[in-house]
Regions:
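Catalytic-loop of the protein kinase fold
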Residues: 14-30
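Conserved HRD-motif arginine in the catalytic loop of eukaryotic-like protein kinases
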Residues: 119
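Conserved catalytic-loop aspartate of Hanks-type protein kinases
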Residues: 78
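Conserved activation segment of eukaryotic-like protein kinases, specifically the C-terminal portion
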Residues: 53-66
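Activation segment signature within eukaryotic-like protein kinase domains
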Residues: 2-3
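Conserved C-terminal C-lobe helix
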Residues: 100-114
Length: 136
């Protein structure tokens, strides 16, 4: 359920035209209501900004491959990091080391695909894919 909470938080940010750019365990808080909340928007930016990133941003291991070059961060960048976070919550390691078996495997693989065009198109789409496998 935590990952779905984070999908909803990202969908809200993305609908406001904001990309987080630093999804990682340290930027997630579990509330007293046992919900996941996304923290630290210090390197967030507008999705529609014409400016390209001029330096690598994000956290090593969670940053999408495109964040290591000079490019524009976007929704797919956040979804990649959320896929890494999901994998880490399940296996304890980065998806490059191990990926869970079963139906979640496909979700992690799609979210962390190195080709942006193959990732989920939105956080809402990722939440829909996760919903059948999560107890809310």
């Amino acid at each position: 359920a935590y990952t779905i909470d984070l999908c909803h938080a990202l969908e809200e940010l993305h609908n406001l035209g904001i990309v987080h750019r630093d999804i990682k365990p340290a930027n997630v808080m579990i509330t007293p209501e046992n919900r996941a909340a996304l923290l630290d928007l210090s390197i967030a930016r507008e999705i529609s900004s014409d400016q390209q990133d001029t330096r690598s941003l994000g956290t090593v291991g969670y940053a999408a491959p495109e964040q290591y070059g000079v490019t524009q961060s976007n929704r797919a960048t956040d979804l990649y990091a959320l896929g890494v976070l999901l994998n880490t919550m399940i296996t304890g390691v980065h998806p490059a080391v191990d990926i869970p078996r079963g139906p979640i495997r496909h979700i992690v693989q799609k979210a962390t695909d190195t080709q942006i065009s193959k990732r989920y198109k939105s956080a809402a789409a990722m939440a829909r894919a996760l919903r059948p496998y999560v107890r809310l």
